[in-house]
Design a protein with these regions (language model features):
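N-proximal low-complexity "stem/linker" segments adjacent to membrane-targeting elements
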Residues: 1-26
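Hydrophobic helical membrane-anchoring modules
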Residues: 1-2, 177-296
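Donor nucleotide-sugar binding loop of glycosyltransferases
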Residues: 16-19, 42, 65
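Short, acidic, metal-binding catalytic loop of nucleotide-sugar glycosyltransferases
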Residues: 25-33
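A conserved acidic beta->alpha catalytic loop
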Residues: 39-47
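Active-site acidic Asp-centered loop
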Residues: 40, 85-87
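Acceptor/aglycone-binding surface of glycosyltransferases and processive sugar-polymer synthases
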Residues: 58-76, 81-84, 93-172, 176, ...
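Acidic metal-phosphate-binding loop of nucleotide-sugar-dependent transferases
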Residues: 89-91
């Protein structure tokens, strides 16, 4: 593999002392001179191990993977291209050249490594596989793009395209935000197959599947407000309308069968129906405005 002089290998870390040394050494040996490790206040020797293997190590000013990536690219990366991966040795340097090829050829501005193309045994639990596929389908439904593996931590992108994005997630939601921003801003995105390895024994994951999965789903939905307003406001409108109709049906049955009137519940049902219809109309209008804006 030839050296990539204008590529920065970005590795956000937190308590990865068991694996970061091998990760840095592999990329340095492969010809990547600029390996940047952004450490989030590890309790172990992660920074020292990374530095000993030749990495450039900085301590992030905040906390969380998302904040680390934003700070690194904006303040510590001077290269035109960034290759981002986790420091847990689950991603291979053997896939690096294929990740970077679409960028260097000018065919894409953002590249996602598809872990499901070669998912090694033990690399991901069945529960996590189910959650990943569910989130990918949700992304395709809400944002109209099928990129196969939006949660992949192996990314390659131009620094210029990254600076176009509006990012705010501090934790693992950074990958989701980046995928949404690519879809929203029309950033050319390529997906390449990669190998995803199990974590080496003795290393612990920082991922909390239920908590982080919930955060990612909320982020997907929140981002739909500006990227797919018809879905965002429409789903709220349908929920409000259906709730109002359900309450109205109960009030009507009670009045017809038992002669009991529920004035307050009737008002609530009417309010729910009116709000729901207004949200649906607002969603249609917002979607029309967004379409006109994209066409200009």
């Amino acid at each position: 593999m030839p050296p990539f002089d204008d590529v920065c290998v970005l590795v956000p870390t937190y308590n990865e002392a068991e694996t970061i040394g091998d990760v840095v050494a592999e990329f340095r040996d492969a010809g990547f001179d600029d390996v940047l490790v952004v450490d989030g206040g590890s309790d172990d020797d992660t920074p020292a191990v990374a530095e000993a293997e030749g990495a450039r190590v900085v301590s992030q000013s905040g906390s969380g993977k998302g904040q680390a990536v934003r700070e690194a690219v904006r303040e510590h990366v001077a290269c035109d291209y960034v290759l981002m991966l986790d420091g847990d040795a689950t991603y291979s340097v053997d896939d690096a050249e294929e990740m970077l090829d679409p960028l260097l050829a000018g065919d894409a501005e953002h590249v996602i490594g598809n872990r499901f193309a070669d998912l090694r045994e033990g690399a991901m639990t069945r529960f996590n596989q189910f959650g990943n596929r569910l989130i990918n389908r949700g992304f395709a439904l809400v944002h109209g793009e099928n990129v196969t593996d939006i949660l992949s931590g192996y990314r390659a992108f131009t620094r210029e395209s990254f600076l176009k994005m509006t990012l705010s997630a501090d934790g693992f939601g950074i990958e989701t935000e980046m995928a949404v921003e690519c879809a929203k801003r029309g950033i050319d995105t390529a997906v390449v197959p990669i190998t995803y390895h199990p974590r080496p024994s003795g290393s612990d994951t920082n991922l909390r599947p239920v908590r982080d999965g919930g955060i990612i789903f909320l982020e997907l939905y929140r981002r739909a407000k500006t990227n797919n307003p018809l879905f965002y406001f429409g789903s709220l409108g349908v929920l409000s309308t259906v709730s109002g109709l359900g309450i109205a049906a109960y009030v009507l049955v009670e009045w017809l069968t038992r002669g009991i009137s529920h004035e307050v519940m009737a008002v609530v049902s009417g309010f729910g129906i009116i709000v729901g219809v207004q949200l649906l109309m607002f969603g249609v209008l917002a979607d029309l405005v967004l379409t006109l804006h994209r066409d200009t």
